[in-house]
Amino acid sequence: MERELRLGIMGGTFDPIHYGHLVTAEAVRDEFKLDKVIFVPAGNPPHKVKRKVTDKKHRYLMTILATITNPFFEVSSIEIDREGYTYTIDTIKEFKKMYGEKTLFYFITGADAVLEILTWKNADELLRLCYFVAATRPGIEGNKIDQELDKIRKLYGDVIYKVTVPSLAISSTDIRERVAKGRPIKYLLPEPVERYIQKYKLYKEDDSR
Ligand code: ATP
Ligand code: MG
């Protein structure tokens, strides 16, 4: 009998996408033997209202450039095509419709995002619709993640797993600040993405205010 499809969903603002995202997605794919990982650039992320997020077309194209060499990676425009704020619950429901009820979904998040899951829209429904994978991330204490995982497991059962991924202390915020200050971003993200940033003169203005 064929086994059910297992899909990883890697959500993010990807402003810009970097090696921290890619190494995390690949490590989780391997650990859970996922058939593929779908990167989903956020359209209008509700938690990032404090700063101007780069045009979604740029973020989508950079995500494509970064993932193109991995046969297991795909990019979905599901969230950037949606008007208004985008919520994970709506995205997962749409994927369920597309792939069928039997497909297992693993939503991949870094440790910082894990600490916020319970505040997400319809968190209880979401935790029943898909598994969550909490990837370690430099700067976020292991203990803190374990505590949060315990809390979630007590409420919802075995729906969340922790995966240790090769530590890369890279963030999009740091990359944007580097570009604004004229400092190098080489080796932090794939070269085509670096070229794209230069070509369209992204992040030239310091937006860290
Ligand atoms: P920003 O600094 O703008 O918040 P970011 O680097 O955190 O950007 P996001 O697009 O916010 O990137 O992250 C998408 C997902 O990837 C989140 O779940 C985040 O925790 C995870 N992630 C980002 N960078 C890393 C990293 N270096 N290691 C592990 N996980 C990461
Ligand atoms: Mg972030």
Curated annotation (Swiss-Prot):
Pathway: Cofactor biosynthesis; NAD(+) biosynthesis; deamido-NAD(+) from nicotinate D-ribonucleotide: step 1/1. It is an enzyme of class 2 (transferase). Its EC number is 2.7.7.18. One of its GO terms (biological process) is NAD biosynthetic process. Keywords: ATP-binding, NAD, Nucleotide-binding, Nucleotidyltransferase, Pyridine nucleotide biosynthesis, Transferase. It catalyses: nicotinate beta-D-ribonucleotide + ATP + H(+) = deamido-NAD(+) + diphosphate. Belongs to the NadD family. NCBIfam families: cyt_tran_rel, nicotinate (nicotinamide) nucleotide adenylyltransferase, PRK00071.1-3. HAMAP family: NaMN_adenylyltr. This is Probable nicotinate-nucleotide adenylyltransferase. The gene is nadD.
